[in-house]
């Protein structure tokens, strides 16, 4: 119910960012160098960037340096934390596609704004109260490190991955059920603790796989690779439908 309410509240920005993010993600550097056409979808890379620039014009809140909940909202109505991670990822993709410094600058500004709004103190329940919300950011920040080699992104990403995987000890004020997202007994990743560790959905398992692989690329630490394989195996057996794909 909680997740559904959040989705409804942010549906405009989320739906558009999913579409635009998928378009940007599908534009690899090598493809962009070969031509300016994205294939049989009927749009060019130039169209994608035009759409992205319009997205930023209407939804990026300059004074707070974060994204609005929707185009009609003022400075007090900003998109929730996990959707900000999606927008952060889009900026990385825009920079990789174009090499335009303005997107690198936007990424830095957005990071600063989100640092002010959400703190990136992963143990602060007032900002971070669901595992998947954190893991979306973990993967995005790992990608930012791979792009910039700026250690600030890697540290926050690694700290976030550790926190999600291991939980917050009760001795440090942790919730009794905040034992970490990973289930060492049955496998898979829980998306929550505050609602009673009620589900192991795609929204936490697959972002965990992606984040672990990005961190493996960033650090060459085989523990991330093994964690990615472990979660992928569980997700393939429990979440993937081989009939429908």
Predicted regions and their residues:
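Bacterial N-terminal signal peptides that target proteins for export
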Residues: 4-16
């Amino acid at each position: 119910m909680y997740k559904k309410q959040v989705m409804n509240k942010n549906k405009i920005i989320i739906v558009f960012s999913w579409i635009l993010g998928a378009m940007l993600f599908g534009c690899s550097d090598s493809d962009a160098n070969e031509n300016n056409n994205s294939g049989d979808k009927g749009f060019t890379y130039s169209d994608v960037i035009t759409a992205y620039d319009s997205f930023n014009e209407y939804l990026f809140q300059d004074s707070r340096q974060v994204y609005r909940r929707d185009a009609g909202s003022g400075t007090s109505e900003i998109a929730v934390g996990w959707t900000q991670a999606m927008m952060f990822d889009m900026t990385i993709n825009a920079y990789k596609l174009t090499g335009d410094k303005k997107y690198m600058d936007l990424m830095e500004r957005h990071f600063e704004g989100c640092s002010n709004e959400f703190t990136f103190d992963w143990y602060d329940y007032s900002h971070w109260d669901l595992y998947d919300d954190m893991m979306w950011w973990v993967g995005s920040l790992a990608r930012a490190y791979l792009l910039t080699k700026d250690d600030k992104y890697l540290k926050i990403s690694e700290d976030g991955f550790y926190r999600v995987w291991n939980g917050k000890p009760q001795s440090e004020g942790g919730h009794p059920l905040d034992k970490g997202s990973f289930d060492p007994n049955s496998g898979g990743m829980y998306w929550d603790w505050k609602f009673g560790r009620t589900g192991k959905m795609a929204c936490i398992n697959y972002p965990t796989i992606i984040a672990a692989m990005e961190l493996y690329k960033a650090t060459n630490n085989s523990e991330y690779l093994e964690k990615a394989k472990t979660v992928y195996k569980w997700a393939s057996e429990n979440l993937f439908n081989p009939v429908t794909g």
